[in-house]
Amino acid sequence: MHGRLITVLLLTASSILAQNKKPLYTAPLGIEAYTFRVGFSKDPVSTLDTIQVLGFTEMEGNSAGRGADSFRLLCQARGINLISYGAGYEQLVKSPDSVAAQAKALGAKFVMCAWIPHSSLFNIDNAKKAVEDFNRVGKILKDKGLVFCYHAHGYEFQSYENGTLLDYIINNTNPKWVSFEMDIFWIRFGGGDPVALLRLYGNRWKLMHLKDLRKGAKTNASGLSTPDNDVPLGTGELDIPAILKEAKKIGIKHYFIEDESNQESIHVRQSIQYLKSLSTE
């Protein structure tokens, strides 16, 4: 009798605890199109079908070589919103109006740049030029109803004065015109702490790339890595729950799973399952 009572009480307690658990990841499921770069280069339509089947409703990327209006319709037919448009640095500097037109035709709210041209090590001269260009381009894009985000890529962690060149870029760009996308892999690879940077710069961060770094990987501030260093979320060095909690606190609403390995189809599925398994407790 007592044994049965204890069993019932334990089951009841477990049920209550399960009901009190809430999912940690509650944002729309997003994908960085570069993850399926091979598929998009061969068959964009089938690749969008795959993205739909996987459950993604948001995407960051471009028009995959098609007309913007045509690609937007293909995405919409599959319930996919292209939230962020990726543009090259030179393209942004030379033709910001053209970039804005393309982004708006695709329905994007953000324009993202992921690389500042530089030779050898990234330096203060590169950073100063980027600040000047970002402030100018960011204002143009804002006037057209878009948010410009610079995607830090790890090479910005060269020391400068009392911080790094990333600190210099963030502190010298106008918050009205320039925001940032955190790629947690590259932040860690370059020597930064994603959680600390989220806390330090708060709502300057508007977007996030979700990816994980292989345990024991050799890191540096080159901004360059090898495909084997990309692993499914939750299997690498990064504290994904802590990062997501801090990102939610500062108001990041759009997250894009990205995988630069040669096993993206397998890794993406594992990463989705991992995100769904996380709870607030």
State the predicted function of each range:
Residues 143-237:
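Acidic/histidine-rich catalytic cores of soluble enzymes
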